[in-house]
C-alpha cells in the first residue's frame, strides 16, 4: 500500500508552500486504487495527504453502482453531486440527487446508495478521519 501511495504521489503534480498544498487530481487518484480519496488517515503519516481531521473524496460513479446500508460511528459527512443522478436512502427516506443536490449526515445516521441512475461525479467530505468508522448494517436488523 505504501509503495502504491508513493508512486501515486510522484505522479500527482503538487506544490507545497509553508502552510498550503496545491495539486491536480489525476485520473489515477480518481479511478485507481485510492478510489478518489484525496486525503485521510489511511495515507502514510509522512505523506502530504495524511490527515486525521478530514477525509476528502472525488468519485466518478458508474451507472447501476450501489453501496450497502451503513453509517459512520463518529464522523460528520457531507456529499454533493457535481454531475449525473443518484438515488440515496438517508435514514429510511429516499432521495434522487442531481447536480447541486447535497446531503449532510450526523454520526450514526444511516446511508444507502440505492443506485446510480446516470454516471455521476460526487465530492464527499467526512470529518474527522477515523479508522474502522464505517459500520455496515444488516437490512434485517434495520
Q: Can you name each region flagged by the protein language model?
A:
Residues 60-62, 71-87, 125:
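Short, conserved beta-strand element in jelly-roll/cupin
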Residues 52, 107-133:
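Ligand-binding loop in jelly-roll beta-barrel domains
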Residues 1-53, 68, 138-142:
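A short, N-terminal "cap"/entry segment at the start of jelly-roll beta-barrel domains
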Residues 52-54, 61-65, 85, 128-130:
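Short, charged/polar surface micro-motifs in flexible loops or helix N-caps
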Residues 40-45, 55-73, 107:
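Conserved short histidine dyad/triad with adjacent acidic residue
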Residues 82-83, 99, 118:
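A cytosolic small-molecule/anion-sensing beta-strand core signal
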Residues 92-108:
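Short acidic-glycine-tyrosine-enriched beta hairpin
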Amino acid at each position: 500500500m505504501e509503495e502504491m501511495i508513493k508512486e501515486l504521489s510522484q505522479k500527482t503534480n503538487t506544490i507545497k508552500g509553508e502552510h498550503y498544498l496545491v495539486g491536480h487530481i489525476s485520473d489515477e487518484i480518481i479511478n485507481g486504487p485510492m478510489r478518489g480519496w484525496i486525503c485521510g488517515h489511511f495515507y502514510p503519516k509522512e505523506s502530504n495527504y495524511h490527515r486525521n481531521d478530514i477525509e476528502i473524496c472525488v468519485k466518478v460513479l458508474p451507472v447501476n453502482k450501489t453501496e450497502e446500508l451503513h453509517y459512520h460511528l463518529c464522523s460528520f459527512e457531507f456529499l454533493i453531486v457535481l454531475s449525473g443522478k443518484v438515488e440515496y436512502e438517508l435514514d429510511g427516506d429516499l432521495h434522487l440527487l442531481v447536480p447541486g443536490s447535497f446531503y449532510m449526515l450526523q454520526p450514526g445516521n444511516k446511508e444507502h446508495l440505492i443506485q446510480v441512475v446516470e454516471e455521476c461525479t460526487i465530492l464527499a467530505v467526512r470529518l474527522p478521519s477515523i479508522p474502522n468508522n464505517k459500520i455496515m448494517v444488516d437490512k434485517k436488523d434495520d
